[in-house]
């Protein structure tokens, strides 16, 4: 494995470990970022099920003209995910940035989710 992959894997493992310690039964908002799209889901780790999810690949996102690889798409995904989670009765989550730095698209998604009703 390359040094960058090892560093990213260690960062992801470190973030997940700290989340497990501080979760307190709250669901986890997990973010995955690829070069073309961004995905987010609210997961209940105790039951092992996904409560709500959203991605930039959904029809309503693509029809709005978002490419998926920019900050505007991340904001739209965060807003959509928060609306779905609040509708499912979830208001508090733990933010799992998945080893990604809290910057750019990840930060935009988190800020949009906060503005739309999720607290973390």
UniProtKB/Swiss-Prot annotation:
GO process annotations (BP): translation
Pfam families: Ribosomal_L18p
InterPro entries (alphabetical): Ribosomal_uL18_bac-type (IPR004389), Ribosomal_uL18_bac/euk (IPR005484)
Matches recorded under Gene3D superfamilies: 3.30.420.100
Cited function: This is one of the proteins that bind and probably mediate the attachment of the 5S RNA into the large ribosomal subunit, where it forms part of the central protuberance.
Assembly mode: Part of the 50S ribosomal subunit; part of the 5S rRNA/L5/L18/L25 subcomplex. Contacts the 5S and 23S rRNAs.
Family in the record: Belongs to the universal ribosomal protein uL18 family.
Protein name: Large ribosomal subunit protein uL18
Gene name in the database record: rplR
